[in-house]
A protein has these predicted regions:
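Long, low-complexity, Lys/Arg-enriched
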Residues: 1-109, 118-181
């Protein structure tokens, strides 16, 4: 059985949006990685501090699936210019190198659907030049079109959204696909 490790930037639709998994949580549901590395910008750190929404949902998913996720938070509290493409490639490359060394027996999954376009672009590029031990995974929206943001992300009730997440069923739709670099 293949072991997986997930590296994911975190974006505004994580962990749950419109009563469906955000990309990061959906990849966890489908691939069941042993370790999950979450990369948070200043704004995402503020949400994390408020209600621990990312770890909360991953741990609840683990309870639902009977799977233990080892979650690591990478906080970048000074990162505000998340739109700048030049910021991410070098740092992501180094982080992923460390992850690969620590988990040499695992396949690394890169979430190329969460975060800003610059974050996703850097991860897609790293996957394209890295070979077979890294898989870029994209996750389609439930509607297969642009996400409508119905909830107020600042007044987010993580317990409510977990309870009413429509993907918490055995017959959920797998929206993951491997990106062909």
């Amino acid at each position: 059985m293949t072991k997986y490790v997930l590296f994911s930037a975190i974006g505004g639709t994580d962990p749950i949006s419109n009563f469906r998994d955000g990309s990061m949580l959906h990849i966890c549901r489908v691939y069941k990685p042993e370790s999950v590395y979450l990369y948070l910008s200043k704004e995402m750190c503020e949400f994390h501090d408020k209600d621990d929404r990312y770890r909360f949902c991953i741990h609840r998913l683990g309870e639902l699936l009977g799977h233990k996720f080892d979650v690591h938070i990478i906080e970048r509290r000074d990162l505000v210019d998340v739109h700048k493409f030049d910021l991410f490639y070098k740092e992501y490359r180094e982080l992923i190198k460390e992850i690969r060394e620590k988990h040499s027996d695992a396949t690394v999954i890169l979430n190329v659907s969460s975060g800003t376009p610059s974050m996703k672009g850097a991860l897609q590029f790293i996957a394209a030049v890295s070979g077979d031990s890294i898989i870029p995974v994209q996750v389609s929206t439930p509607a297969k079109k642009i996400n409508e943001h119905r909830e107020n992300i600042k007044d987010y009730d993580v317990h409510f959204y977990w309870e009413y997440n429509k993907d918490n069923t055995k017959d959920f739709e797998n929206r993951c696909s491997k990106s062909e670099s």
